[in-house]
Each structure stands twice: as C-alpha cells, then as structure tokens.
Amino acid sequence: MKKIALIIFSFVVYNVSAQNYKDALRYSTEDLSGTARFKGMSGAFGAIGGDFSAISINPAGSSVFSGAQIGGTLGGNVTKNNITYNGTQANNRDTDFNVNQFGVVFPIEVATSGWRKFSFGFNYQNTKNFDASNFSFSGRSNQNLGDYFKYFADGIKQQNLLLETYQNKQVIERNTLQDIYFDMGRLAGDRAFRYRNALLGHYVGLIRPHIGRDEIKPTDSDADADAILQETQYNKNVTNGADQRFERVTSGGVSKYNFNFSTQYEDFLYLGLNLNAHRINQKDKLSHWETYASTSTITNAYFENEYNTKGSGFSFQLGAIIKATKGLRLGVTYTSPTWYTFNQEYTQYLSTNNRRNYADPRVIVTLPDYKFRTPGSLTASAAYLFGKYAILSADYTYKDYKNLHFGSAAKNSENDLIENQLGETSTVRIGVEGRIPIKTGEATNYVSLRAGYRYEQSPYRKKIAPVGDLNGYSFGAGITLGGIRLDASYDIAKQTNLYQMYETVLTDNAQIKSTYGNFLFTFTAQLF
C-alpha cells in the first residue's frame, strides 16, 4: 500500500506551479465562452442583452428578456499547436467536449409607475477550459537536469542530503528517502523546495559532491570524514547538454456562476447587478525525459511534477443599457476585481538508469492557502438594431493587469514582477446578426445568421511576451420555432505564446503557435 504523507511549508519562489504570477495571470483572463448565439457574434453583447451569456458581460441584459427562459449549451474544443523548441518542431492536437453554459431567467412585469420590469437570473459558464490544453515538445538543449539540480544543491552541506546519520564515523541511523523529504518541509521560506530538489538529484546520482565521496569509512581520518559531511559544492554527473522531451497534461477549468438582478425603467433604461462566484479546479502533470551521451555513467533521466490546484473567488458587476434612439443602444459595465483564495498540492518523482534507479518520496506537499486579486475592468458597448432584421454590435473592454496583486508579504517579489512585466490591455469585440423571417401558418419564425471578430491584447508590456495578442473570428446560425430556439456556432482564434519548462536554469523558450477551434450547440426554451 502506498504511504502518503501530508505536510505544509511556506511559499517557494522556485515552484513552477500556479504560485507565481504567470499562472495567477492565467486565472485572471477568461476564454470567450457561453451560448452559441453569443459566441457566433464573438461576444459583442454588452448593449444588446436578451441572452444568458450577455448577462455575464452586462447584468442589465436580463431585463431585455420578454419572458422566462431556460437554456443550455454543449460544445467541443480543438486545439492545434505548432511548437518550436531550440530549432526542433512538433505538432500537437488535443480535443475536449463539455457543458459550456446553463442559464435561467425570470423577468417579472410590474405595474409600478416608471419601473416596468424586474428580472432575476442565474447563469453558469465554463470561463477557462484546461482539458484541451495538453502539449509536448522535444529538442536539444545545452543544459540539462544535472545543471538544474546542481543549482539547488550548491551551498547545502552534504550531511543534509545523506540518508545515513553519522557519529564518530559510524552510521547510527538509516533513514528512508521519504523521512528526509518529509522532514525538509519544516524548513522556512524557499529552503524546503530547494533542499528537496537537491535531495532528489543527489539520491539518484545526477549530481555528486565535488569531493568525490558521499559515504564515510571507519578508516577515514576525522578531517576527511568532516570534509565529506561539510561539502557544499557539487558537480553534475552527466555529460553536457541533452536530448529532451517535455510533456504537459492538464485538466480542469475555471467556472463562473452569475447570480443576477436587473430592472427596466420606462422604455429606455436597464440597470443590473451580478454577484459572481468563481471556482478553479486544475490538475497538471509535467513530465520531462532526457537522454545523454553514451559515454556518460547516466544515460537517461525522467523527472515528474504533479500539481493539484483548487480555488474559489468572488466578484460583482454593475451595468446599464440605454436606448439612445429607436435603433441605437449604449451599454456600460464595471466588473470588480475577483478576490481569490487558493490551495495547492504537489508531488515529485525522479529516476535515472544509475545506481538507485528512482526517487519516489511518496509525499504530498500541501502549500499554505494564499490569496490574490485579479484586475477589474470597464466595458463600453454600442449596438444598432435595424428593426427586427439585423443587429450590429461592438464592445470595448479596458483592463490594467498591473492591478493583479498577491495578498501575502511573502509574495512581494511576485508583485514586483507584475508591476514591471504587465500593463494595460484593450479587448475589442464586433458582431453582426441578420434575421430572415419564415412564415409558418399564422406564426412567424426566424432563421438567424451571425458573424464576429475579436481582438485581445497581450497583458505583457514587451513585444516578445509569454502571452501574445489573440485574434479570433466566429460564425453562427440559429432558428426559432415558436418558444424554442436552436443555435450553433464555430469560433477560431490564433495566438503565439512562449513556454519555459522551469523558472530557473532550464529556461529556453518553446514557441507555441496555437489555433483554438470551438463549436457550440445551444437549446433555449420559453417557460412562460
């Protein structure tokens, strides 16, 4: 039976997990998701309303509904990656199917003078989907895992990396790898993560002490024995460079739950409020293979890190829609920051073909809860309705990612990086819908055709950035049959990102040119 140990220690700056600003940034952005009608117009719904996903852009939009409705959306994602790593190219493809959206809204007509309608609604959306985010790449690097573990080990006394406890040149206690790895969790600050990595590299032989020995013999002099224990410099035990293969397998996502209230005043003003709950559940498995020259004592190595991240958050939105003229609609929305609380666990595994073949501590490291705040945003919207037959709509959103902030003083270095690396962004969405009336007996139904474009600016200040600008196009169609509406959409977007295996030493960038494809099907029914 596999033994599991749970321990807690402080935040570590070396971690490649969501405890650095890059992954906090990932949780601060949202994918374009929602109903097929919404997606078919690239989400340009801030001044239109009357759609479940429009509520997530402008909460005033629920009072545009003429009656109670319920609807849900199923969809699929296809991600294609063209990856270049140190001159070697790879092509990946990943797919996923999911429930993208579910909503219900209840508008209530009132006879009160001036205030004509109150509306209550709920909408769920999958705002970030990690299930179609797997990728892998290979290539040749001038540095390898030997360099990586040497970086952590240098400066640590070898006596802290040995399983044996010596006294008077005699072994008085033999510990297990799990015991030592577990006990290192009591070290403060970043030392726990540093010591653990050094322990793994030393245990499997990827690094060796500069003195050349890691055990004491009874015949050693006191000076020699002390030199072995006090050694703080290490050499990598493999040849320079490596053929590398890296794979990331991730699952989960970010969900948002809108609890909505809105009202209509006279025939020209709509006001709304959203109280939003956010939930994050992500699992990451990072696998790293290396092959070295045949002249090396160690010819291959495998390093694995698994992360489990969970979080919850709260935000709110205030919105308004104004009928400026018979056809012109104007909208504005303020979206507050999202206040998140996170917890995270991870495990490590390392193996080589040398002496002790593998290091499997079988310890689940539980990090302390931490908090961060995403930036808020402002959205301005405009739409023109050509009677019942066409809509032209546009949204503009401003967000300043310098306002992303970690709440703990232990993460001040991350806040400094945010201040230096991130900046202001603009997002533009444009959509059009045309409606073709179809006479069916005495009823008139409609076939709708839709198209849209969106641009999302990179949150990074520099031109060559880990996250690039995104450009996307969408198309859609729908049909109303009495109180039933069926919609479908297809969206495609392109973006170039940079990915590093680790935050230190092995930092060569893999350039990932991604094409995201998404198709959705929405069923909506009038309740009463």
Give, region by region, the residue ranges found by the protein language model:
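Positively charged n-region of N-terminal signal peptides that target proteins for export
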Residues: 1-4
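Short, linear, compositionally biased motifs with a strong N-terminal bias
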Residues: 10-11, 66
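N-terminal signal peptide c-region/cleavage motif recognized by signal peptidases
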Residues: 13-15
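Outer-membrane beta-barrel porins/channels
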Residues: 19-33, 38, 105-528
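Transmembrane beta-strand segments of Gram-negative outer membrane beta-barrel proteins
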Residues: 20-45, 63-80
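Asp/Glu-centered strand-loop micro-motifs enriched in Gly/Pro and often flanked by an aromatic residue
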Residues: 39-54, 91, 244-250
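Outer-membrane beta-barrel translocator/receptor signature
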Residues: 48-57, 63-139, 255
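Short amphipathic alpha-helices and their capping/turn segments at secondary-structure boundaries
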Residues: 60-61, 265
